[in-house]
Structure formats: C-alpha cells, structure tokens
Amino acid sequence: MPRRNDLNKIMILGAGPIVIGQACEFDYSGTQACKALKEEGYEVVLVNSNPASIMTDPELADRTYIEPLIPEIVEKIIEKERPDAVLPTMGGQTALNLAVSLSKSGVLEKYGVELIGAKLPAIEMGEDRELFKEAMARIGVPVCPSGIASSIEEARQVAHEIGSYPLIIRPAFTLAGTGGGIAYNQEEYEEMVQYGLDQSPMSQILVEKSLLGWKEYELEVMRDLADNVVIICSIENFDPMGVHTGDSITVAPAQTLTDKEYQRLRDYSIAIIREIGVETGGSNIQFSVNPANGDVIVIEMNPRVSRSSALASKATGFPIAKFAAKLAVGYTLNEISNDITKKTPASFEPTIDYVVTKIPRFAFEKFPGAEPILNTQMKSVGEAMAIGRTFQESFQKALRSLETGRFGFGCDRHETLPTLSHLRSQLRTPNPERVFSLHHAFNLGMTVEEIHELTAIDPWFLDKLEDLVKTEKYMKQRSLKDLTAADLRYIKQQGFGDRQIAFATKTTEDEVRAYRKSLGITPVYKVVDTCAAEFEAFTPYYYSTYEPEECEVLPSDKPKVMILGGGPNRIGQGIEFDYCCCHAAFSLSDAGYETIMVNSNPETVSTDYDTSDRLYFEPLTKEDVLNIIEAENPVGIIIQFGGQTPLKLAVPLQKYLNSPDCPVQTKIWGTSPDSIDTAEDRERFEKILHELEISQPPNGIARDYEESRVVANRISYPVVVRPSYVLGGRAMEIVYSDEELERYMTYAVQIEPDHPILIDKFLENAIEVDVDSLTDSTGKVVIGSIMEHIEEAGIHSGDSACSIPYTSLSDNVLTTIRQWTEQLARALNVVGLMNIQYAVQGDQVYILEANPRASRTVPYVSKATGRPLAKIASLVMSGKTLEELGVTEEFIPQHVAVKEAVLPFSKFPGADTLLGPEMRSTGEVMGIDSDFGKAFAKAELGAGVILATTGTVFVSMSDRTKEAAVPVVRELIDLGFKVVATSGTQKVLREHGIEGVEVVLKLHEGRPHVIDWIKNGQIQFIINTPSGEESQLDGRTIRRAALDYKLPIITTIAGGKATVAALRSLQDHPLDVKALQDYLG
C-alpha cells in the first residue's frame, strides 16, 4: 500500500526527561520518526519537554513544542496546530499513557485526530493486565497463574487462589516495573500491594505466581497493515526471571534456545501481535521458558518502540523506529527499502553472524540507604553494548565498555577472595556485582553445577565464563614472551584486553600492545549489515574482532575527524554529552569532513548508523581507541564533547600521538590535554587564578584526616569536601564539624587513594551562576549564556533549576563574570567550549570551577538562545574563527527558559530526597514562556511536580532559614493558601506578625502528626529545609512521605520564592503554548 495521502500534519509525542527505565532510546526513536515522516513530505509537530534531546532541535520537526507532557497542555497544542494524526509509539510509556488519556477524555475525537501506529484498543490490550490475559486465553498462549487486584482485599483473595509465595506484583500502566517487586511472605506482600496500587495511574496491579529460576527471552516483532509480520531479533537474558530485563545482562541472538523452542516463541509472537491488534509498527514480547521441561509462558508485551527495540536496532542495523513510522502512514514492509543493503526490503528478516551483549550500569553509590539488590523494578541508569564474533568476546568488551574501573571478566586487579559462605549469599541474591562474584566462584573452585544451583544462570553461559578463568590461569603461569602468536590470538578472540594480559603476565599495557603488534596480531573490523554478509553493505557501521579475516573498513580520500562519545549513561554524564557529539558530527560532515563516531551506548542518537559517516561500536578505552586511530588515520580527534570519558583518555592519547613509533599524523583538536589538565589540577589552576587576580573561596588540599582537619579549621566550617577529578560531584559533601569530616575522610579516601581531597569554604546563601562560552584559535571569546541557578550554591549544578536569562544579578557582578570568563579562556588557551561556575555573595564574585569542555548545559543553552554551541565549537576546532561564523557577541533572549532537574528517588525507597553537592538527577526538562513565573511553572509541571493553586502548605524550617522563610510564607497567605507549621516555625512566624498558623505535631510529639496529615490528604505541598542532627530523622521521613504521596516538596528558600512566582502566574491566567520556532524567530 502506498503512503496515506489523507494525512498532512502528524504530531509525534516524545518521552520527556530521562528517567530510570526511559532514557535516550526514545530520543533515538523520536529522531528517526521525525526524519522518516518529513522524508515522506508530512508536516511534523513534535511535543517533548526535554531540551537535551536531538529531536527537539528546531530544524528536526516543522513545529517543536518544548512543553510539559500533560494532557491539558497537549490539548492546547492540538487545538492550535490541528494535526490529522498523533503517533504515540515513539515516546515510551509517557507517550502511550498520554495518548490513552487524550483518547478517553474525548480530546482526539473533538479535534478529529486519529491515533496511528497503535490504536486505543491495542494499547489497552497490551498494557491492561486483565485484557492481555483474556486475549492470551483466546489464542491459547499460556500465561502465568495470576490475578488482578484493585484493593488490598482483592489482592488477599488473589494470593489465596494462587496458593503459595513468592508472588510477583506488577502495577498496570507504569514504567520499568515501577511499584513492583517480589514478596516472600504475607507482610511484604501487603506492603508491596499498597505501594503498587499507589504507583499505578489506574490503581490496578497484577499478582503472579513467581517464575524465579525460569529463563527469560524477548522477541522484537513488526507488523504492517497487510498483516505481514517479521521477527527482527531474539534477545536472551543472562539473568533468570526475577530481575527486570533492563537490569539484566542480555545477549542477542538468543544462545540457549533449541530450534523447536525458538519456533514456538516465534509462532506465539506472531499470534500475539495479531490478536492484540498492533497493525503498524514494532512490539516487544517477553517470554519465560522453564529449563526443566521447555514449558513457555508469555510475560508481557509493549505495543510500542521500547528500550529493547533500540538494542535490537543497534544489534542488527535494522532501524525499527524509522520503519515503524513509515508503517504507521500506510506503507507495507516489502515497500520499504533497507538503508544498509539498499537491495533488501524491510520484510527481509535480519540475520546476524556475531554476538551482541548489553550490560547495565548502576548508581547505587549515589543513594545511600538504598539496597543494591536487583528485582522486578528497574534501577540501572545506563547500559553499554558490545559486538564480538563469540559470546566471550562481546561479554568482555561490554564489561570494559561500562567504565566502572573494570577491564573485562576479572584478571584486572588484585582481589581478596571472599569466604565461601559470603560468596554463596552474593550469588543467590541478584546484585550489580554478581558477575564478578561468578569470577570469584570459579577461582575458589566452585563447579558450574554448584553455581547454576545458586544462580539459575544457564550452564551454557557458566561454561563460557569458566573457560575465561582457565585462560586467565594459563596466562598467569607464563611470561608475556612465553605466549606464542597462536596463544595470543586465541586470548584476544576470547575478548581479553591488553590491560588484562598485562596484569596476568606482570607487564604493562604498552608492552603487551608492542608485543602483540610485533606478532602481527591486530583487530580486523567487520560490518554490521543485517544480512550476515549475504549482500553488500553501504553504511560503514563497524565492530572489532580478532578472527583472522579480512578487514572490511572502506578506504576513503576525504579528511576524517574522529569524535569520541560518552559511553554508557550515568548520573552526571548523560544525553547532554551525546547531543554535543551528534552536533559535532552534523556540522563537520556539512563542512566536508568524513566523521567517525566511537561509542558503546546502544540508546543514543550518536550510535545511529546515519548520524556520522562511520560508526565504530567499541569500548572507549585507550587500547580500543588507538586501534581505530591506526585503522582510520584521522586528521583530528575531538575529545571535549563526551564528558569525562574521552577526557580521561586525553593524556594517554597525546602521549601516544607524540611518540616516535606512532604510525599516524593525527592531532587532538580543540583545547590541548595540557590545558584541560591545568583546569582539573587544583594547584596549577590556582596559580593561573592568582596571576589573573580572580577570587575563589578559601580552600586547601589534604591527603589524610589530620591534614584535612587543619585546613577545615583554618578556613572555618562549613566546608565542601571532594576528591579531585570528578564528574557529577561524586563523593562530594558539605560538612559542618570535625566529626562529620572524620567520617567523610574515612569513607572518601577509599574511593580515590591516588588523588588528594579538595576542601573549599562553603559559601552559604550564595547564588550560583553557570557560564558557557566559545573561544576560537585567535583568542576571541563569546559568551553563549549566563545562567542563574535557583537553588543556592552547594546544591550540585546538575540538580539545580536555572534560568536564562539571569534574573537578579547586578551590572557589576555581570561585568566581573564576563571579564573573568574572557581572561580565563585566553589563559587556558581554550579552543572550543568552556563552562565556568561562579558563586555570588552580594556583589562579591568567586570562581568555583572551570571546565574547558562541553558541559551538560550546552543543549539547554542552544534551545533557549537558538545558537547551536556544539556545532559552532566543532567548526572552531577545525580552524574557523568566530568572526567567519558570524558569532561575535553574547545573545540575550527576550523570553525566559528555565531548566529543571528530574530525580529518580521513587526507585530507591531507602534514599533521602534531600539535594546536596553530589549529583543525583537522571534528566532534565525545560519550561519556556514570556516571564519567569510561567517558565518555572512549566518546568515544574514537566518534571512531574503537581502544583496545587489552592489548599494547605506545611512549613518546617531549620533555625538557619526560619527568618528567610517569612516573606515566602507571607506571599503564600496572600495567594490564599492556608499555612500550617511545626511549633518552632510557627513561633518565628508569629514574632513576625503572621498570626493564625496552626501547629502540626512532629513525629515524636504525638498524633495526629505531620505524616498523618500527609496520608489523610490534608496537605497540598511542603516547604522543609534540612535541620541539625536531632531532627534529621523527622525531615527525612517527611520528605520521603511527600515523595510517596506525590506532594511537591521544596527544600530551599530560593526554591520557595520561585514556586511562589509560579503559583502567582498560574492563578493569574492559564498557561499558553508556543512553538520553539516562534520564540527563536
């Protein structure tokens, strides 16, 4: 069937901010969909609240709305734009839930808008647990014994019918298992049921008999309007049932299915997608197989593009989201051409002659109090993927891609082996470190059978891992020169890195590299081509392997530039850096360079086969990057866009490129590694600041507790302490006493023994300011934007809301900031981007830090000002001047854009929600409007904060902030809110003339206390600033209850003032919507 000509304008719903369970994969799918529909001549309207996404670039869609993804706002956009259809399958769970809401409320019918990609009955049947179960019964596909409950009483009845624990709780219409879990007894069960009902938007849960120990598989399936169905990829979970698939190591294609079992899953998948009624596009279907007898049960399906779709796309080269968008407008699979081969249609199922492994990355260290245990609720914050000719090769490459300080399956550090009893408990309970517990187990002599008994991991995988430990022992018994060429090739084919070989043979990585090359053992690069080399591939998408085959890298005469990506997402380094890498690839391709992207993250736009001219899906380690440099011989390498990942490689790369035996003429483009090191090295940086007469907070350096105590007492408490060389404020804290400092030093020095601890005076009640600037090789400096933070200095900049333009900075302060930025950019010889953070106390400005690289604010600044900083910076690095590019002065927009952080506390039930100097947000949203109040209100709504415009506010302030809270409380009363407070706060308010404030009891003062008020729905939002030790427990419990009951909680005075401005705006007039293209002219 040809494309539908009855549609002209199509709205795509995005996924919003990056959260656990919904990350960059939806930027990837949304970007592909925008391109595919525009290619077909449709007018595209995009709605998404995430400024860090490529899809919200103004040139990607015809009309781009960076607005909150809530039904009331999307209705206004529909009313304004009058699209013919809405495509909801590209924006994850957020977009599906929005589509259901707009459909059921009658909005789509009112404006004559059609749902394409998935109709309402298909979405509901795929997402509603009861309807899905009924559908499976109709087609004879077995499901797990289960029952649906909408109350505790119903849940008790379901548990009685199933008959035995453990039971699995799965809330309906939630993302990444939010609110779910495994209950081993009745008490746990009832707690989890209540939590699950609260988390489900429709207060419905599915209770299932536990299939712990069964194997888990996924199939990626596509269907068109002519009822053609293709299976794109099978994926096997290394971890058995009981661990969320997003937290499990996964392998494609499935390794341990018999042909008969695979055919059965395939037949079931085709029957399921037809019965559910997904007419056009992709679905992900999850199965469980009993290893004892081969019984199959279907677990669930996602009637949309998913995290697994992104993985399947990158694993096979088959662009699922692009094809799904084309199917949604009427094409059939056989009418769509495969871009990679240019010969085969999309109905030609991909075949792959390699193995792909994905390993998740966790951030439990960011959430003290949260147990590092994996279950059915997803907790990982990112993932790395690797490709190899064997499972062993791809598995070890994926482990070293994670960037967690490990270089493969062990064999990379001296370790004390645990006791057998401790090890058994580590193996029995799924946790992020379990993969290395397997390594310990083989070293302690445990058998495959014993380990399988404890973990239920398939013996096939365990055999392969045991084989790696045998190779490790073989290497440790020999010197490097004892290893023959055949030995070394076999070792490299198993995925061992040079670093691991060096550890085993007691040599250095450089010695291993030199010896390996002297024996002629170098990697070859193979193409990901969707067809196992049956047809020629036209898109250079490569992976390395050590099989003795020919290298498939295509020669080229164009000058090449290599861009090093950011690796797996983590807190502190996410989509913002991928955005910068993509922009570099786009602008340098347009300038005539051949761009080479190196990255290991399957979720991102940068690892899409058509973002750069060449893509290497490889780990970002010294060994892997040097191998690619030698294969490609680029003229330049860009390291300043991928966050800390490529920066860590700067010095070793420079050392290699300067060495006499380097066979290539490659240069690192932009700011030199030496200048980057100067900014990172406290002593070198201070010397420059001293020469330039730039102030910084009083500070010092310490290597142990005694030194740190002397420094802290010299500069006076409170102080900020942190290790040198960090991103995302890792292990950074504000301490108020010698006792707190001693606890910190004991904990933090273990983290970075090689680097000293930095101690700075903490500037209380200071305003923090971020500046992004551009500098060219002539020393011309142009400020991209000056951003004013809403939370005061001391809250990590990545967790703080901020505003463009600034709202309260004086002319004197602005002059100082601009002068210091220019002086520092020149002193550091910056070429490209630099980010500087300042703190302002009154009219006194202090510099906090300077980073001569792309920062996480670059996409936000680019969207707010319309000036693509990363594109400009990459052209500057290629030798262009800012004058030539027409960028000569700072641009201050007439509108206001507010960026707000999105935090993942709901996934970590034990963690405190209080913000501090260590970054914990996973993503961000932007609100844009004509004034600050409206823009901040939109940012809060986009971040999921429900701002009530009437009702009761509970106020509990620390002694330090009680005075400052008075004006905020006065304004809330002016706005018509009822204010209630703790006795101490009420006393201060009364002293300042605020009468009639009711006292609410603290937890230890009797009942009904504040938590009772929260649970009874008597409070609409909370202002609670953290107090001293004795009331910390109260504050923590209140903050946690606010999160569980979805109440807005403000923990700073500055946040209170901004919220008052937003509430005033919302009361004055309803929010309006406007396309980004109209703001930017």
Curated annotation (Swiss-Prot):
Residue positions annotated to bind ATP 1 are 129, 170, 177, 209, 211, 216, 242-244, 286, 300
Query: What is the name listed in the Swiss-Prot or TrEMBL entry for this protein?
Result: Carbamoyl phosphate synthase large chain
Q: Which residues form the MGS-like domain?
A: 945-1081
| Superkingdom classification of source | Bacteria
Amino-acid positions noted as binding Mg(2+) 1 in the UniProt annotation, renumbered to this chain: 286, 300
- Region Oligomerization domain, residue ranges: 404-553
Q: What is known of its domains?
A: The large subunit is composed of 2 ATP-grasp domains that are involved in binding the 2 ATP molecules needed for carbamoyl phosphate synthesis. The N-terminal ATP-grasp domain (referred to as the carboxyphosphate synthetic component) catalyzes the ATP-dependent phosphorylation of hydrogencarbonate to carboxyphosphate and the subsequent nucleophilic attack by ammonia to form a carbamate intermediate.
- Name the reaction it catalyses: hydrogencarbonate + L-glutamine + 2 ATP + H2O = carbamoyl phosphate + L-glutamate + 2 ADP + phosphate + 2 H(+)
Q: What interactions and quaternary structure are annotated?
A: Composed of two chains; the small (or glutamine) chain promotes the hydrolysis of glutamine to ammonia, which is used by the large (or ammonia) chain to synthesize carbamoyl phosphate. Tetramer of heterodimers (alpha,beta)4.
On cofactor binding, the record's note says:
Binds 4 Mg(2+) or Mn(2+) ions per subunit.
| Binding locations of Mg(2+) 4 | 849, 851
Q: Which PROSITE patterns match?
A: ATP_GRASP (PS50975), CPSASE_1 (PS00866), CPSASE_2 (PS00867), MGS (PS51855)
Q: Where does Mn(2+) 4 bind?
A: 849, 851
Lineage start: Bacteria, Bacillati, Cyanobacteriota, Cyanophyceae, Synechococcales
Q: Where is this region: Carboxyphosphate synthetic domain?
A: 1-403
Annotated pathway: Amino-acid biosynthesis; L-arginine biosynthesis; carbamoyl phosphate from bicarbonate: step 1/1; Pyrimidine metabolism; UMP biosynthesis via de novo pathway; (S)-dihydroorotate from bicarbonate: step 1/3
Identify the residues that bind ATP 2.
722, 761, 763, 768, 794-797, 837, 849
